[in-house]
Amino acid sequence: MEAALLVCQYTIQSLIQLTRDDPGFFNVEILEFPFYPACNVCTADVNATINFDVGGKKHKLNLDFGLLTPHTKAVYQPRGAFGGSENATNLFLLELLGAGELALTMRSKKLPINITTGEEQQVSLESVDVYFQDVFGTMWCHHAEMQNPVYLIPETVPYIKWDNCNSTNITAVVRAQGLDVTLPLSLPTSAQDSNFSVKTEMLGNEIDIECIMEDGEISQVLPGDNKFNITCSGYESHVPSGGILTSTSPVATPIPGTGYAYSLRLTPRPVSRFLGNNSILYVFYSGNGPKASGGDYCIQSNIVFSDEIPASQDMPTNTTDITYVGDNATYSVPMVTSEDANSPNVTVTAFWAWPNNTETDFKCKWTLTSGTPSGCENISGAFASNRTFDITVSGLGTAPKTLIITRTATNATTTTHKVIFSKAPESTTTSPTLNTTGFAAPNTTTGLPSSTHVPTNLTAPASTGPTVSTADVTSPTPAGTTSGASPVTPSPSPRDNGTESKAPDMTSPTSAVTTPTPNATSPTPAVTTPTPNATSPTLGKTSPTSAVTTPTPNATSPTPAVTTPTPNATIPTLGKTSPTSAVTTPTPNATSPTVGETSPQANTTNHTLGGTSSTPVVTSPPKNATSAVTTGQHNITSSSTSSMSLRPSSISETLSPSTSDNSTSHMPLLTSAHPTGGENITQVTPASTSTHHVSTSSPAPRPGTTSQASGPGNSSTSTKPGEVNVTKGTPPKNATSPQAPSGQKTAVPTVTSTGGKANSTTGGKHTTGHGARTSTEPTTDYGGDSTTPRTRYNATTYLPPSTSSKLRPRWTFTSPPVTTAQATVPVPPTSQPRFSNLSMLVLQWASLAVLTLLLLLVMADCAFRRNLSTSHTYTTPPYDDAETYV
């Protein structure tokens, strides 16, 4: 123990002052010891030295408390006492108080050291030294000096008991040296007519603790809480002792025979465990007023010491989330508040949260003069020129890992950092990514130009499935061609799984829409993997691209004669004079093609929000116009029930026993003034008040079928079944995420400086930073919560009627176009799908006939059974539906 004084790396000084009488024990509170957070095996080896003066001679008593385990035990006795009397270990206690605080308690009426005869009156306590060695081997020391020497006079304390004290059935509980009890009492006068004074005494096991009110009394008791401070004998705790007197009776309603009711709460400290569980709390109080003569009253309560572990013993911690790209990540630890450029003694430690081996997991420790510590794996660090300390971690894998970092300066001021490192998943998206300034990086694989519009809140998502690029809409891109996938940096929060991709400004038509689609004669294989999530909507852009399709998982009826392996429904080709027969009808379920299941999909999930898919799927090129409008649908969750319809359906459900999810939406109106041309096509939505309509025949959505992301494992952010989500007015340029309802708080992923592409979150919430913004438009949502159900209409569109959902929609083709206040560019007329319409009508009436026949059979069966039941003779009432007998 003598050598311990030489290895103290950090020392805390304190001055101890004893107040009033000696209660029979000395208590020294020791603050700011480092109990590391997120570490169940972080122990501390604690020793103490008690320095006495015996007739001018120094005497040391060394105590060994062993290893402290703050998560399992709160009270410790010395394992050994060196230089003390035989029973010295029974005279000391070390107790954890919570928040990194300790309390060392020693009996004062018994001597812990051996003395000679005649020295009994000459033993004084001078100081106390506590040595705290943490799991990193750092020695923390606390030196507590007595302001005045405290003489230990051994004596026998007689047993004290107060008579004429009313007993209560309330127990006073002591936790971490703090007593807390609430007692009912009565006073002869009401509030405002009474004063109040109180004192307490705790007796037991040769300990006598007295506490008195600091100001003597409350001169006037007021309605409500009357707070006061109290002072207890012995050591004054850094946590003040006090009490609260509260009137519980109405002002003019005394309790017969007792007076007015009050509630008294007392919280004295420190209360030593040396009292024992057989000790008693005595409360003496008085209340005198001008209208009644008062007197002294006494109530008593038993005291019990709790073995409950106190509130968190861990040091306060700052939490930071870091999402990084690549193989390593760096975190900079700033100087502590009391540190300057000349501080000579700085220590930085780091360990992974919840380690299981104290022999190998606590090797990462750096000082200003030390080099790279041995045994520190996956973590490296160095002091920078500005005194910050940069910690670099590597080889962490894909799962998030938590690193606990502490930094301590010369005066033992310590800050703790909890850093959660999360590696961004590998991206397969073709969308541009963000750099550290928030600008979209250009597409580097296809060489397509990126938009000149600078987004301020866009982040390329992590996607495990194929997507299609929308960086250039001047010419269709074969679906097998993907844009360069760059590392992405979304925070791995469940709120960030909405698909976001870069789309150019497409408010004007492209220059290549008059040329035939290169691959219009045959479906182009998009990818070799089926896309399970084919219900992602497209948002609000109004420019066409060449021969593209929108995923339509909600097929209206199965058709055996599918002429192409395309699993998605085709959009009508505009400007033709004859029906297009490329694909007669979409498959019932877009998640698994029923025809040509082994063939590659010709159109993968369209993840372009505000753009269009670039995969041509039309089987024959149109003559006059080569554009099939797919992106003016304004975030329609599911397609219409006919591949040639240009009018909104009047009925939201069909007879098809489809297992798809979103079967209640409809297509917006297209208008046309061009007789043959198809250039300058703009979709508009008719002005109409939207309401919610949910189909009763559509099954509940299966997991993963309405996701915005194309790969498995991405949480769904698309609209719910039966929902039409249409943007109002002109959509914002380069919108890359679904729209949120008005008033919904928008959570926006942000960009951090980690690796130039980190996206930080804190506590599972999004944080806003550089490159983030919040939409001010009432019907837009840049981000959103993927876990929040969105069942709404948030723009103008034709609504599905609330009539029967078992009828086929009425198809109209010759009605004049309905326009809105928006500027519209006409759309060329289309031919009527007579043969397709006729077959649908036949199927409709056939289905109705089958349903009618089934209904008649059920009615006949019910009548037959009822006739049979009435032919029997009952000796007791039959308990039929008409009457019940009791």
From Swiss-Prot:
Q: Which Gene3D superfamilies match?
A: 2.60.40.2800, 2.60.40.2810, 2.60.40.2820
The main location class comes to virion
Chain segments annotated as transmembrane:
840-860
**Compositionally skewed regions (Low complexity) per UniProt:** 428-437, 507-595, 638-660, 684-699, 761-771
Subcellular location per UniProt equals: Virion membrane; Host membrane
Q: How is it modified after translation?
A: Extensively glycosylated.
Keywords associated with the record? Glycoprotein, Host membrane, Host-virus interaction, Late protein, Membrane, Transmembrane, Transmembrane helix, Virion
Question: Its uses in biotechnology?
Answer: Primary surface antigen capable of inducing and reacting with virus-neutralizing antibodies. Almost all EBV candidate vaccines are based on gp350 proteins.
What membrane topology is annotated for this entry?
Single-pass membrane protein
Any single Gene Ontology cellular-component annotation: host cell membrane
**Hey, which stretches end up on the Virion surface side?**
1-839
Bias category Polar residues: which stretches?
442-488, 596-637, 704-720, 733-760, 773-806
Carbohydrate-modified residues: 47, 87, 114, 166, 169, 195, 229, 277, 318, 328, 345, 356, 378, 386, 411, 435, 443, 457, 497, 519, 533, 554, 568, 589, 603, 606, 624, 635, 662, 680, 714, 725, 734, 759, 794, 837
Q: Where is this region: Disordered?
A: 423-810
Instruction: Provide the membrane-side ranges marked Intravirion in the record.
Output: 861-886
Lineage top rank: taxon: Viruses
Q: Which family does it belong to?
A: Belongs to the Epstein-Barr GP350 family.
Job of this protein? Initiates virion attachment to host B-lymphocyte cell, leading to virus entry. Acts by binding to host CR2 at the surface of B-lymphocytes, facilitating the binding of viral glycoprotein gp42 to HLA class II molecules. Attachment triggers virion-host membrane fusion and invasion of the host cell.
Q: Can you state the subunit structure given in the record?
A: Interacts with host CR2.
Q: What protein name is recorded for this chain?
A: Envelope glycoprotein GP350
